[in-house]
């Protein structure tokens, strides 16, 4: 029984940006960017979010721009 579970393929993550039809990631869209930030304020990894590498770079750039413009916090406020 354990062998059958080990042979099972993991389910592929659905790309949330492709699902919603989003082609351009804007730094002013904080509602979208918050989906890709952890509760600690870190940018989530590709393997967690399911986006492509190009989209991940665009998200990272948009989050950094939004932080610079004070639209997103650099770190979480909770301790």
Curated annotation (Swiss-Prot):
Q: Which InterPro entries match?
A: Ribosomal_bS18, Ribosomal_bS18_CS, Ribosomal_bS18_sf
Question: A Pfam family name for this chain?
Answer: Ribosomal_S18
UniProt keyword list: Ribonucleoprotein, Ribosomal protein, RNA-binding, rRNA-binding
Select a single GO molecular function from the record's annotations and give it.
Answer: structural constituent of ribosome
Is Cell membrane among this UniProt entry's keywords?
A: no
Any GO CC annotation of this UniProt entry: cytosolic small ribosomal subunit
Annotated Gene3D superfamilies = Ribosomal protein S18 (4.10.640.10)
Q: How does it assemble?
A: Part of the 30S ribosomal subunit. Forms a tight heterodimer with protein bS6.
Know the name of this protein?
Small ribosomal subunit protein bS18
This protein's species is Salinispora arenicola (strain CNS-205)
Which gene is this protein's source? Answer: rpsR
């Amino acid at each position: 029984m354990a062998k059958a579970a080990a042979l099972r393929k993991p389910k592929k993550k659905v790309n949330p940006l492709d699902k919603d039809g989003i082609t351009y990631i804007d730094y002013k869209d904080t509602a979208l960017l918050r989906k890709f930030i952890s509760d600690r304020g870190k940018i989530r990894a590709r393997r967690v979010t399911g986006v492509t590498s190009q989209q991940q770079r665009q998200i990272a750039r948009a989050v950094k721009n939004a932080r610079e413009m004070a639209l997103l916090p650099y770190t979480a406020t909770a301790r």
